[in-house]
Each structure stands twice: as structure tokens, then as C-alpha cells.
């Protein structure tokens, strides 16, 4: 019975990941940030003319971005790597895996390793329905990096601290 429940939970996470992939695939490139990050960030913050063609372009762009706009250089480096070189399709695949992992990690954190189909379903519904601006934060290209990936890494870090941190 336990094996059957494990397989149902795994199948659920896989199904949600596939559905999330379809949503990402159907989400168009946004004309604001998604297009802007395909180019080397300009010093004047207006003339986006040089497309990202290499890692060197990304380093130059992120240096300017850091000086002109904000300090999210690590996340935006990865964003420009995908937006300029690797492409949206690979990002969609990785993001769907990360979304499934996010549901799993949140469930582990909340239920203390007693994952169940109910906890996965509840977390999924809460993410889809209660997250303000789910489309902007979890489906648009820039939002995937700024929110989904960073959120998952943060929860992974918290889980690591809980497991290996000093116990009082």
C-alpha cells in the first residue's frame, strides 16, 4: 500500500510538472522584460541595440546592469544566459522540473517528510489560486528566474539549514 501511495504521489508531481510545462510553453514572450534581457544592458538605460551572443556579452551587460539598475546580478546572469543564448524551450523544461520540486520541498517542509497526495494537491491549489500574479511571477520568462527559481533555492537552503544546522 505504501508503494502504491508513493507512486501516486510521484505521478501527481510528474503530471503537475507536465501541465506547468504546457503553461510555460503557451505563455508568450513579454514585450517588456523578456525582450530587454535579450540585449546587452545599455549605459543610458534606453538604447538596446547589441544582442547577447556570448558569455562575455552577459558579463558586460550584468556589470552595467549592476551599476545602473539593481544588484540581482546572479539571477539576471542566468536569465540572460537563457534569454540570449540557451533559449526559452530549455528554460521551460528546467522550470517545470523546478516547479515540481518546489511542490515537493514545500510539502516536505510543512508535513515533516509525510508527503501525501493531499499535501501536494493543497500546495498546488494554493500556488495557482492564492499566489498574487501567478502568471507574472511563475510563467513569464523573467518571473521564472526572479521568483520560481529563487523561491525553490531559498526553500532548499532552509531545508539544508534545518537538516545540518546546529541544534540548540
Predicted regions and their residues:
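Hydrophobic core of alpha-helical transmembrane segments in multi-pass integral membrane proteins
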Residues: 14-22, 100-104, 121-129
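Transmembrane-helix motifs of polytopic, lipid-linked glycan transferases
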Residues: 93-118, 156
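Individual alpha-helical transmembrane segments in multi-pass integral membrane proteins
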Residues: 87-99, 144-152
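Extracytoplasmic loop-helix module adjacent to an early transmembrane segment
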Residues: 20-67, 79-80
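Short hydrophobic/aromatic helix or loop-helix immediately within or flanking a transmembrane segment
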Residues: 64-86, 93
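Short hydrophobic alpha-helices at membrane interfaces in multi-pass membrane enzymes
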Residues: 163-168
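Start-transfer (signal-anchor) and selected internal transmembrane alpha helices
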Residues: 1-21
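Membrane-interface micro-motifs in multi-pass membrane enzymes
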Residues: 72, 119-162
Amino acid at each position: 500500500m505504501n508503494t502504491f501511495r508513493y507512486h501516486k504521489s510521484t505521478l501527481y508531481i510528474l503530471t503537475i510538472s507536465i501541465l506547468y510545462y504546457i503553461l510555460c510553453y503557451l505563455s508568450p514572450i513579454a514585450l517588456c522584460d523578456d525582450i530587454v534581457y535579450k540585449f546587452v544592458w545599455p549605459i543610458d538605460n534606453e538604447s538596446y541595440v547589441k544582442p547577447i551572443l556570448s558569455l562575455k556579452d552577459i558579463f558586460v551587460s550584468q556589470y552595467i546592469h549592476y551599476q545602473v539598475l539593481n544588484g540581482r546580478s546572479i539571477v539576471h546572469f542566468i536569465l540572460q544566459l537563457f534569454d540570449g543564448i540557451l533559449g526559452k524551450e530549455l528554460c521551460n523544461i528546467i522550470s517545470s522540473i523546478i516547479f515540481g520540486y518546489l511542490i515537493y520541498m514545500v510539502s516536505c517542509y510543512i508535513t515533516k517528510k509525510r508527503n501525501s497526495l493531499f499535501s501536494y494537491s493543497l500546495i498546488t491549489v494554493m500556488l495557482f489560486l492564492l499566489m498574487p500574479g501567478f502568471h507574472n511571477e511563475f510563467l513569464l520568462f523573467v518571473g521564472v528566474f526572479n521568483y520560481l527559481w529563487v523561491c525553490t533555492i531559498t526553500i532548499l537552503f532552509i531545508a539544508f539549514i534545518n537538516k545540518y544546522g546546529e541544534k540548540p
